[in-house]
Amino acid sequence: MNKQTLTSVLDKYYLNGTVESVKWVIKDKTITVDFITPMKNLVGKAISPNFDLEDSEIGIYNTSQFYKLVKIMNDTVVLKLNKSERGTPLEITLADNQYDLNYYLSDLNLIETVPSINEPSSYDAEANIDSDFISKFTNAKKALGDVKQFTVKDELTDDKMKDLVIVIGEGNGYANKIKFKTPCESMFGLTEIPFPADVMMEVLKANEDATNGKIQISQEGLMKISFTEDGIDSIYYLVRLSDQ
């Protein structure tokens, strides 16, 4: 299989080291990975076709370690499972024209169960995410350094349209902040809601090459972020920060 497919799937859930332990579910050459951050502030799912591994459910306990193995491989990688006599997957092998690598799999009982998200019937605001949005957010976050939150709200424009207003920076009045806007659709309005900035930045960086991106926000404090990139669908549910 194409190494790029494998690394893209890893990027979508690993989020630069934010998520380590996951269960891979492979069926009919399609992989589905559900995941949750250790802080429980983000739940997500990555789905990719063209994943050349037999139908199975396997535990990847240390994605950092697995990623290091994948990185040294050539562009085409052959994945195979080694199983016990009872058919339990024990290890995954990776092979190219240089290396034969073995990665031992985790007991699935050691992988945290990912909860289902109770989505609202409709969201209160919706906006597209493009490369400009991603660039503005990541540049602002880098400029401000170790800020922990960003807020979103909607705002009426001069021509009676709606903008989504994103403010990156801490909540107190004396903190440095950076604000930018993007067009949005909002039926009933959206008052200011705080979300974790670090996790949002990693989500955007992991999907900076996406051809399709969308953000949907519920006033109840849930943000849904979805992307499509080269056939890979990734969905993230970000939970609001509690009021200080």
Pin down the residues of each PLM region:
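DNA polymerase processivity clamps
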Residues: 1-103, 122-244
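Conserved active-site/ligand-binding neighborhood in enzyme cores
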Residues: 108-113, 132-136
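Long, charge-dense
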Residues: 110-124
